[in-house]
Amino acid sequence: PKKEVVFFAIGFETTAPVHMMALKEAQRRKLSNFSLLTSLFTVPPAIDAILSDPGSKVDGFLTAGHVCAITGNSAYHKLAEQYKTPMVVTGFEPVDLLYGIYRCLLQLEG
């Protein structure tokens, strides 16, 4: 191969496995012209940045259950306590999201 292929791997922690699959496939095929340029982030620091802004008007967060199934939810507990902001782990189905909103509202009222 005469041209370099650069795969821009951008996203949050849930996208990392897909990027690694691409890299493993390139290695399996012995592609010497495949590179991975990553810009991967984790969600808790992004939430921290939002909540540390004095102008932030966010009242609560619905956090992704599929992420917490891998990483756990302790980082969200710390942020919720630090900023006194509800963070509820939910799925993506409508009933899950509605229940998450309900749980956020209960915490805000409490």
Give the ranges of each region predicted by the language model.
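Phosphate/pyrophosphate-binding betaalpha-module
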Residues: 8, 12-75
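A conserved active-site cap/scaffold subdomain adjacent to cofactor or substrate pockets
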Residues: 55-110
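Class I S-adenosyl-L-methionine
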Residues: 1-6
